[in-house]
């Protein structure tokens, strides 16, 4: 390995693990915040459970990604077949949970916001139950499409083999036949189009409701809207930003995946795809925390308690 390649690998390693570090810290804060709010007995919002769940999923997924990617920089492979299959399949499994939970969150928020005259209003009472069943079903379906990893993932024995698609120094994918590749490509395309399309529709629906709400508020007040947003509007904007960010990341990830298939697992494309694929898991909790006004109230309350304790002890 020459000096330029060494510098490139070092810079890439620092950049990727910085992203992973930010993601782990942000998801841990978001998960602890929702846990603490639940322990304190605050009345939870209907979207708190899906957001807390996706924070936990992203936390585990990023830890797995860090462990798998560390093997990418090892001087020699050290995993066996079982380890490769286990870690790569678990990573894909938690990615599927992330996508399905994000889709469930967008649909759930759209159902909550729909007016009573809408056909979606009849799902309001039973929406948590229905969406939980939908989440479980889609997670199983999403993961089953990636079940071929249990067969295709193997420990890399010879780095000079031209038939393998390299994932890390220790793990590779066996090449698939053209018929199997077409089958899995069709299933993957159907899966992505369905989930991303569902999220896109629910996002557009929420944006439409938000615009209508602003228009009606302006008509009632006969003036410009107050710059202070209501909690409901902040919740809508948070979900809209999450969905928009997810759709952008998913589009880039799909393009990179397709490009890797065309160019037979090019390593440079894989190096670009890794941080792109984990961008949503790493930075989405920052969007939620930035728009979470309850966090500010919680921090002020904790600060007041610390000040009181210090005054009592002194």
UniProtKB/Swiss-Prot annotation:
Keyword Transmembrane: yes
InterPro entries, per database record: Vmron_rcpt_1
GO biological process, one term: response to pheromone
Key word Transmembrane helix present: yes
One Pfam family named in its UniProt record: V1R
Membrane topology (UniProt): Multi-pass membrane protein
Entry GO CC: plasma membrane
Disulfide bonds: 84-171
Keywords: Cell membrane, Disulfide bond, G-protein coupled receptor, Glycoprotein, Membrane, Pheromone response, Receptor, Transducer, Transmembrane, Transmembrane helix
Gene3D superfamilies referenced in this protein's UniProt entry, alphabetically: Rhodopsin 7-helix transmembrane proteins
Membership in a protein family: Belongs to the G-protein coupled receptor 1 family.
Role according to the record: Putative pheromone receptor implicated in the regulation of social as well as reproductive behavior.
PANTHER family: VOMERONASAL TYPE-1 RECEPTOR
Protein name (record): Vomeronasal type-1 receptor 95
Species: Rattus norvegicus
Gene name, Swiss-Prot/TrEMBL: Vom1r95
């Amino acid at each position: 390995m020459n000096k330029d390649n060494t510098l490139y690998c070092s810079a890439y390693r620092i950049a990727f693990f910085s992203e992973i570090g930010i993601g782990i810290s942000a998801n841990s804060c978001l998960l602890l915040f929702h846990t603490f709010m639940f322990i304190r007995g605050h009345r939870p919002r209907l979207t708190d459970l899906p957001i807390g769940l996706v924070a936990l999923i992203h936390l585990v997924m990023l830890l797995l990604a860090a462990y798998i990617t560390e093997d990418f920089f090892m001087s020699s492979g050290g995993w066996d077949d079982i380890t490769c299959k286990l870690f790569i399949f678990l990573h894909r499994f938690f990615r599927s949970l992330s996508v399905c939970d994000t889709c469930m969150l967008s649909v759930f928020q759209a159902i909550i916001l729909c007016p009573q005259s809408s056909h979606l209003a009849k799902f309001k009472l039973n929406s948590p139950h229905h969406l939980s069943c939908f989440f479980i079903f889609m997670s199983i379906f999403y993961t089953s499409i990636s079940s071929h990893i249990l067969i295709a993932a193997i420990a890399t024995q010879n780095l000079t083999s031209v038939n393998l698609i390299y994932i890390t120094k220790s793990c590779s994918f066996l090449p698939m036949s053209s018929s199997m590749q077409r089958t899995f490509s069709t299933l993957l395309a159907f899966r992505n189009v369905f989930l991303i399309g569902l999220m896109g529709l629910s996002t557009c629906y929420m944006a439409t409701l938000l615009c209508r709400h602003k228009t009606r508020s302006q008509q009632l007040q006969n003036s410009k809207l107050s710059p202070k947003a209501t909690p409901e509007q902040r919740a809508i904007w948070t979900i809209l930003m999450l969905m928009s960010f997810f759709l952008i990341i998913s589009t880039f990830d799909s393009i990179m995946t397709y490009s890797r298939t065309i160019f037979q697992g090019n390593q440079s494309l894989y190096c670009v795809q890794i941080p792109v694929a984990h961008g949503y898991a790493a930075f989405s909790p920052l969007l939620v925390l930035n728009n979470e006004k309850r966090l500010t109230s919680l921090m002020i309350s904790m600060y007041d308690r610390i000040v009181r304790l210090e005054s009592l002890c002194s």
